[in-house]
Amino acid sequence: MAPYHIRKYQDSDHRSVVNLFCRGTEEHISASFRYMLLLPGTLLILLGVPLTLFLASGSWLLVLLSTLTLLVSLWLLAKYPWEKYTAMCLHSDMADIPRTYLSSHYSCFWVAESRGQMVGIIAVLPVKDPLLQRKQLQLRHLSVSLEHRREGIGRAMVRTALQFAEMQGFSEVVLVTSMLQYAALALYQSMGFQKTGEFFYTFVSRLRNSPMICLKYCLTSALNDLKT
């Protein structure tokens, strides 16, 4: 296991942070594609449409072309929500990380480094609801490079965010993640985050029945247990 350390974001980190964020998001496209591929409705279409065309035309070429068209369409459907999310982030909070996350005592952005390389990112920001801004801190953009998974970096970064939240007087840390982000979801739940609800981010996510999962972590005694 390579040594690593966690520190606050610096201006010189921007390119590496964006690259790590984009690579992490792109990984979910293939997971979404596999998930959609195994849905009963998808299997019915992938089998039914080519079979119908073959029975109607007797052409294997038409069967091949229709199957390829359906698979490409499925890939584009899997890709669209993640590309939309990435573009939204790069044009909003991550367009100016210092202004968004480092201009207030109640927000922060951290990076993890290992042997001079950027291997992880995580950020926290008060929720937008004015009534909850001094109660709930939102955890965002947790990502660990593929080569450094299972080294405890993600857990350490989440713990850093939770400790920051407690020091700043927040009582809850909340986040939203996709049900298709299996490793992240398992990590959060193993650290004590509890599911509070779910919603569909796009029409495509509703179509494929893959909601976003809302999680909450209650601080104070729970954080003391985590430290031990």
Swiss-Prot record:
GO CC terms in record: membrane; nuclear membrane; nucleus; perinuclear region of cytoplasm
Name of the molecule in the record: N-acetyltransferase family 8 member 3
Family: Belongs to the camello family.
GO BP field: gastrulation with mouth forming second
Enzyme Commission designation: 2.3.1.48
Transmembrane segments: 36-56, 58-78
Role of this protein: Has histone acetyltransferase activity in vitro, with specificity for histone H4.
Domain N-acetyltransferase, chain residue ranges per copy: 61-217
PANTHER family in the record: GNAT FAMILY N-ACETYLTRANSFERASE, N-ACETYLTRANSFERASE FAMILY 8 MEMBER 3-RELATED
Record's subcellular location: Nucleus membrane; Cytoplasm, Perinuclear region; Cytoplasm
Species in which this protein is naturally found: Rattus norvegicus (Rat)
